[in-house]
Amino acid sequence: MRYLVDTHTHTIVSGHAYTTFLENVQEASNIGLKVLGTTDHGPSMPGGPNLFYFNNFKVMPRKLKGVTLLHGCEANIIDFKGMLDIPDFTQKKLDVIIASLHDVCIRPGSVEENTEALINVMENPYVDILGHIGNPSFPINEEVVVKKAKEKNVLIEINNGSFVSRKGSEETCKKVANLCKKHKVNIIVGSDSHVCFQIGRFPKADNMLKEIGMPEELIINNEENKILKYLKNKGKLKDLNLD
């Protein structure tokens, strides 16, 4: 399957990634991506950017080198109540927010605690995507989370990077994907790139989705406008006109 969108990418601003915004855009253009999300880590990540970075996206272009640009954040969930490490006044300015659990920002809890964190964060209307919920460091009740995502119209990410960097993720990601298929919940495949050469490349995630027969209509990033319409329907991207 050809993917035209990657909403989960990092720049050197994240502190442990290795390419710049412009290098990422150039690579996205080179491989034919139509939409690129820049979602650097929130400020509680060691080495991450401060809030001024996220509050200054007004200076950034909407399109560059034939690529529509989404300026967002992979925000860290910092407690089991679903609190994020960026305040509401920043959240409302962003094009896209991925909410993720990272063990350097919150201690892994019990299945009940981790599930509660994800359930609670989906009550936040600015959250668009749950990031890498297949991470075995944070065991969850996958079916409860998937059903809540459908109720709250939140996208479930299938994170290609998890297959490589988070040992044991493959089985959980497959379980999550099968539940999304069962309950007809929209998913989005993300590279979680920390260097430009990973952008738009989802081989392991794509192979798994093919293996389980994931319906293409549930995959948001196999067309350019699916993600843009999704975000506009949430009141975002007000400056963007869709042809």
Swiss-Prot record:
GO molecular function, one term: zinc ion binding
Matches recorded under InterPro entries: Phosphatase_YcdX_put, PHP_dom, PHP_phosphatase, Pol/His_phosphatase_N, Pol/histidinol_Pase-like
Residues the entry annotates as binding Zn(2+) 1: 8, 10, 74, 192
The protein's name: Probable phosphatase CBO3379/CLC_3322
Similarity annotation: Belongs to the PHP family.
Binding residue positions for Zn(2+) 3: 74, 102, 132
Binding site for Zn(2+) 2: 16, 41, 194
Signal peptide from the UniProt entry: none
CDD domains linked to this entry: PHP_HisPPase_Ycdx_like
Pfam families: PHP
Keywords in alphabetical order: Hydrolase, Metal-binding, Zinc
Enzyme class: hydrolase
EC number: 3.1.3.-
A Gene Ontology cellular-component term: cytosol
Swiss-Prot/TrEMBL cofactor(s): Zn(2+)
Cofactor note: Binds 3 Zn(2+) ions per subunit.
